[in-house]
């Protein structure tokens, strides 16, 4: 039996953080060596970080990445390793994976298919390498190495690459690599988290290993790398159609290795037995780069306990989406806190669902970090903070790093005041009350004197609502500034779609953790957190005080009985309209037709009113979406104009389409 010990690593990197990124890669090398690993696959662009954006066009970025690569070479003795970096070749930047073997740079594989949809803008920074093309890349010392569409023969073991997006396309490179008889396909990836996406990855890794008759190593990034995208890790190793090792997801560690023992003879004989396998005997030998390597010496290292971790029980349960949401946002918040070197989090806790959800997620960030890293690990991660409690537990850490404030005006009620206090107490947050009624009254007096008339709800409704939200902004910002904390805003995606928020009021903040998720899911998730909660952490029964309420902005006088859904439409309908109109790009008439069978409890005429309301509010409020604080990417329905959904600030507002809708709705019998 010809056995190799292989590993795929997930790394929590930071764009342009040269010291940390290099140390983290070195740590992966050291752990792999200690485990007796001879083949190690690291993530895409791991030396620079994936999210460098326009810094990929900085000569400094390219030089430092190359220097880091050269610095790592001696540490790869006795191993075959791949690391990702940008490479400037013939005045074009390519997204490359460098293959290092026994202390030498063997070659550079350039990515063939660039990710240019969703949050990805790779074609802005990189050029796609053409299939079948091989060149020589000049090194600073005057020597050259192969670059391009390469595969490798390292001491008789053959390696090929699919770099992230390469594996997601129909004509993936693996088919040609199979013809060259490769033993391993290495996939260094930077695949951001989205709900359910792990299952897609598993399918192409498994199918690639089966169809190509290879062992497939999939490495990924981990954590909140650059602010918006969350990477869940989840390394995968498959061989001949079987998943042989999986790594855990949403880890708070800097890195994790997933390892496996691979029987090289078994995979080769599998290819030999396959009637459909056709070796490419006339293939271009220039594409195969050969390097010497002593596998006998490499495999003589004693193999110790493997460091790969199986999927947690939460991934097998019935609440996978709820668990993914909780763990993804918790990890993203913790990483944002430490990478921004902030003093904590500050939050205006209104007593409603959105701010309660944000507070719970902050507490979950601390709970998750402590559960995995323990006291010493959390202190190390938060070493920028001068003062942490002597005894670290979830409650003491939340008390130290989360400040909440309830800010009532004369239109606030005891229900929300009591709910805010109850949630803060249950979570352990430091809770304050800032009564802004006098500030609110002061603005009304100033404006009424200026315009020469009293303001009235019948004629000045929006202005009177918005000023209440805006007077809450200066005080909560001041609290955040006192401790150098991140102010968290609480708008959700449903509100962002229709602009149901006060700019410079409840949108105030440095980070908007839930702006990527819809209100309907948030309400469901809060009920789940009240009764069930994530595996290993449990429920928060105190959320019952939130879940009993109907969502309300609480900006009109108490007698008005204001609710969000009266102002807008039912939230489940709003989310369905948003998906049809924005994600799927249907016209107003088409959206109206789609909604009728989905919501038969409402008349066609009423649905037409709500569909028109959505399109009007959507078009009118793009300027607000442009100004929202950065939010986390969670699925394919994101409205972030910087990374996902671009829309003109000024447009025709669907006037012609909505006229057609009104005519059609008017002709339908009621």
Question: What is the meaning of each model-derived region?
Answer:
Residues 1-348, 359-388, 426, 431:
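Enzyme catalytic cores with a strong preference for nitrogen-chemistry domains
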Residues 155, 214, 225-226, 247, ...:
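ATP/NTP-dependent adenylation/nucleotidyl-transfer catalytic domains that generate, transfer
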């Amino acid at each position: 039996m010809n056995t190799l010990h292989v590993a795929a690593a997930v790394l929590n990197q930071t764009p342009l953080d040269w010291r940390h990124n290099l140390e983290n890669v070195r740590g992966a090398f050291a752990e792999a060596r200690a485990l007796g690993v001879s083949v190690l696959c690291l993530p895409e662009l791991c030396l620079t970080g994936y999210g460098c954006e326009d810094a990929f066009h900085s000569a400094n970025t390219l030089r430092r990445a190359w220097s880091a690569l050269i610095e790592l070479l001696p540490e790869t003795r006795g191993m075959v390793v791949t690391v990702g970096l940008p490479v400037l070749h013939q005045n074009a930047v390519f997204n490359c994976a460098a293959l290092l073997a026994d202390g030498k740079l063997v070659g550079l594989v350039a990515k063939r298919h660039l990710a240019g949809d969703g949050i990805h803008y790779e074609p802005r920074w990189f050029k796609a390498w053409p299939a079948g093309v091989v060149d020589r890349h000049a090194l600073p010392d005057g020597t050259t190495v192969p670059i391009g569409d390469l595969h490798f023969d390292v001491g008789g073991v053959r390696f090929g690459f699919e770099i992230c997006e390469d594996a997601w396309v129909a004509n993936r490179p693996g088919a040609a690599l199979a013809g060259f008889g490769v033993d391993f396909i290495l996939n260094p990836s930077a695949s951001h988290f989205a709900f359910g996406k792990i299952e897609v990855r598993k399918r192409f890794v498994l199918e690639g290993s089966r169809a190509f008759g290879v062992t497939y190593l999939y490495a990924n990034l981990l954590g909140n790398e650059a602010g918006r995208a969350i990477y869940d890790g989840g390394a995968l190793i498959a061989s001949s159609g079987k998943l042989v090792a999986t790594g855990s997801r949403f880890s708070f560690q800097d890195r994790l290795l997933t390892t496996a023992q691979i029987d090289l003879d078994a995979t080769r004989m599998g290819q030999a037995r396959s009637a459909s396998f056709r070796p490419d005997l006339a293939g271009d030998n220039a594409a195969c780069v050969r390097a010497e390597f002593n596998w006998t010496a490499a495999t003589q290292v004693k193999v110790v306990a493997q460091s790969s971790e199986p999927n947690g029980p939460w991934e097998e349960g019935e609440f996978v989406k709820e668990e993914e949401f909780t763990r993804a946002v918790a990890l993203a918040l913790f990483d944002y806190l430490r990478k921004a070197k902030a003093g904590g989090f500050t939050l205006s806790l209104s007593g409603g669902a959105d701010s309660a959800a944000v507070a719970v997620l902050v507490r979950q960030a601390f709970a998750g970090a402590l559960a995995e890293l323990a006291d010493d690990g959390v202190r190390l991660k938060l070493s920028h903070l001068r003062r942490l409690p002597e005894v670290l537990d979830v409650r003491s850490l939340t008390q130290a790093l989360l400040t909440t404030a309830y800010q009532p005006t004369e239109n606030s009620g005891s229900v929300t005041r009591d709910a805010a206090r109850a949630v803060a107490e249950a979570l352990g947050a430091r809770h304050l009350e800032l009564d802004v009624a006098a500030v609110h009254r002061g603005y009304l007096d100033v404006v009424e004197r200026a315009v020469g008339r009293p303001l009235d709800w019948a004629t000045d409704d929006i202005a009177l609502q918005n000023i209440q939200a805006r007077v809450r902004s200066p005080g909560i910002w001041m609290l955040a500034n006192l401790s150098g904390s991140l102010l968290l805003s609480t708008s959700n995606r449903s509100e962002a779609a229709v602009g149901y928020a006060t700019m410079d009021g409840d949108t105030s903040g440095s980070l908007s953790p839930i702006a990527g998720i819809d209100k309907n899911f948030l309400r469901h998730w809060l009920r789940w957190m009240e009764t069930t909660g994530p595996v290993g952490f449990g429920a928060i029964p105190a959320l019952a005080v939130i879940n009993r309420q109907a969502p309300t902005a609480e900006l009109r006088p108490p007698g008005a009985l204001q609710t969000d859904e009266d102002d807008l439409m039912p939230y489940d309908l709003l989310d369905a309209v948003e998906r049809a109109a924005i994600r799927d790009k249907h016209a107003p008439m088409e959206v109206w037709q789609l909604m009728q069978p989905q919501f038969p409890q409402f008349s066609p005429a009423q649905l037409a009113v709500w569909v028109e309301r959505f399109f009007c509010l959507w078009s009118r409020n793009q300027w607000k979406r442009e100004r929202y604080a950065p939010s986390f990417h969670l699925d394919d329905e994101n409205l972030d104009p910087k990374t996902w959904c671009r829309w003109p600030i000024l447009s025709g507002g669907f006037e012609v389409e909505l006229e057609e809708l009104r005519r059609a709705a008017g002709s339908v019998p009621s």
